Amino acid sequence: MLSRRLAILLLLAAAPALAQPATLSGFADEGVFHLYMNEDRLGSIKFRWQADGSFESESTISMAGQSVTIVMTIAPDREGRFARIESKSPQGTVVTVREGNVARRTFKEKTETVTIKPDARLFGNYAPPLMSQAVRLYDRAKGGKQAFPLLIIPGVMMEASLEFKDKIERTVAGRDIEFLRFVYGVPGVDITVWVDSEGKLYFADVPAQRAAFVRDGYEALRQVPETDPLLSPAKYEIKLERGVGVPMRDGVRLATDIYRPEAEGKFPVILVRTPYKKEMAELQARFYTRRGYAFAVQDCRGRFGSAGVWQPFMREPEDGYDTIEWLAGQPWSTGKVGMIGGSYVGWVQWWAASRRPPHLVTIIPNVAPPDPLYNVPYEYGVFFMTGGIWWADVLETQATADLSGVALSKVLEKKYKKLLAPLPVIELDKAVLGKENPYWREWIRHPPHDRYWTPANFLDRLKDVRIPVFHQSGWFDGDGIGSKLNYLRMASHGHPNQKLVLGPWGHTDTAGRRIGDRDFGPQAIIDLQRDYLRWFDYWLKGVENGIAKEPLVAIFVMGSNQWLRGNVYPLPVTRFEKWHLAEGGKLTSEIPPAGAPPDRYTYDPADPTPDPRFYEETEEEEKTVRSAEDKKKEREAYHEKVTRERRDILVYATEPLAKPLTFAGPVSATLYASSSARDTDWFVRLLEVEKDGKIFPLAMGKVRARYRRSMKKPELLKRGRVYEYQLDLWQTGITIPAGHRLRVEVASASFPMFSRNLNTGGHNEMETRHVPAQQVIHHGRQYPSHVLLPVIPETELKR
């Protein structure tokens, strides 16, 4: 018995110590950091870090007449490792408590656990001094890029890196100081940090985000003279007129903030028209005004400070025209007007341009949709239900005007699968918004072929819109079809100076390098703000900065992580290849033989096919304590779980590719299908499947069958007849490596993102009666269903 006890004790002694985060003790610092965006101070962080490892900070961010304060405290254990982190903000209090290598994060009565990796460092978005912890643990003797686990407060484990860059001496506050500079690699962004010999942080620069943290008294570290001769320098002070009432043709006045250089003379004008509160654009306005532009920010009709009734889409063409011409006629204006902005703020540019105001010189519509029939609120006849009601909720709660994020967080917390399940769809505004919403109901009462939409459709008006346009979007932009359709329509009319930039980004006007767990490298981050300024400098000021001599088109290829450039889109080297749906769930570049049996499934609106990408925890699941790792695995496995368990999703896949396949540009699909219904929907997804089975979505298209020929003249189906359907799968750019598979999925619903087709031929959003549909997908030589890929020859890629 004694020997057995001794053996157990020896085993315990030999076991490795429980994995612990890195210590915070043995270092002390306190002071104030200031947060800058471009030249503007956005906030301050007051902090105190004590030698026992305790840390406290108070961060205050101020913008648009609002201030938000975030208070954080870190309490250490006896070894100086964090034991408890508490973060208080207007959204609530998050508490992270560690026991050994497991931390429990609690927010709004929801708790999840996080496994802390050995020697994990801490990082806080508004606690820059914490970066000193990683710097002090850096092995200078070893050098190079050193990886380490990072706990991003309040409790997300990531991998980060730190690399010594150089030493630099600067004179600050009357004394010479030698700084060590490191590149701190946080997932998706690199931060250049300046520290002293003890590891104390003085300056943290985030070039990709135009942001910087600088210690109070050391502002000289970020005051680097503008040396780019191709850009207008930031040399002007700013004067601001708030709430100027710009008159419209019907007498309504729209509230407009006008920023102007504090100087004599006339200046070109940049206009932003927004439904999201004009004050929220003040940082952008100040950036351009310092560089010699008058900048006007206007609340759209019926929004915030502007008079009139808010009705999305409908009055924007005339209001945009009238505002442009009013600005051009002001005594401080050169008469040249440009526009910029993303999403709806990009949309209003197209509406204004379609009316050809004489003084509109150029536009930069970032991530802008096309006509409302091809994206929001309809996409080729299919009603974008979640997108439409979510946007209405954001507008009605004025969530975009709330700097604290409280209003938006309430919108995002809603459980859409449950809320959007009842019929009819038109009544869902009551469930989500708590009341009837006039424009939600207008969208539904007027289907795509209704003349109601004529004032909002601009694509057919672009023939005579001969202005230079800077189109910008991303492969994962939820409005990305706009950059495709808008660019292609302008190009089809032969309009010159159509610049197009498509990167591995989402719905944003800035560049990033990550989507989910995929990192596309530093090549993906380009300085778009610099390019926008150069564009305006050339077209509004006549500055010969070379932008007109550069290739007009730049598209990013994921996987090979490089840019391809040319002057037209698709690129001239593009070779369109058909990849065919075939018997047995195969996807092949060869035309399948004739006589293959079709594939069949039943689509039942009573149990609508779920969107495999719409993962949402139920309220009961949220109350269950689970690990963040398990939740992540469940989210990642959800797509495959849905396609495996459902019988109403057809899957076609290639064999593992023998060699890499690169395609970049517009994607489409052709389906030959029949249905027992008078009307139904078709959805096609394109995906990459990694060696381990993980799915990476690339593109999706959809069409409501009655609109297969025309958006203006719907035609119901004849039951059982085979029809050809053309589906627009938007666009993407990627190299699929050898060993991975290409996959196509076909379904007839994508709930709750899009409203279900009831299969009756009636009004799908105003009726409740529904019937199942027997769906048949044909393939083979007679009915060659396929996806069309814009293949790029391997020789065009950089080695």
Task: Please name every model-derived segment.
Residues Y36-E109, G199, A204, I363:
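N-terminal mature ectodomain segment of secretory-pathway/periplasmic proteins
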Residues P261-G329, Y378, A511-F520, R644, ...:
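Cap/lid segment of the alpha/beta-hydrolase catalytic domain
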Residues Q146-F148, R290, W351-D464:
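Accessory cap/linker subdomain of secreted extracellular hydrolases
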Residues K410-E427, V501, D517-R799:
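C-terminal, loop-rich substrate-recognition/catalytic regions characterized by aromatic stacking residues
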Residues V465, H471-S473:
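Short beta-strand/loop motif that positions the catalytic acidic residue
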Residues G26-A28, L42, Q91-F179, E198, ...:
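Solvent-exposed helix/loop surface patches that form functional interfaces
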Residues W332-Y344:
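Alpha/beta-hydrolase fold nucleophile elbow
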Residues D228-G265, A653-K659:
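N-terminal cap/lid segment of alpha/beta-hydrolase-fold proteins
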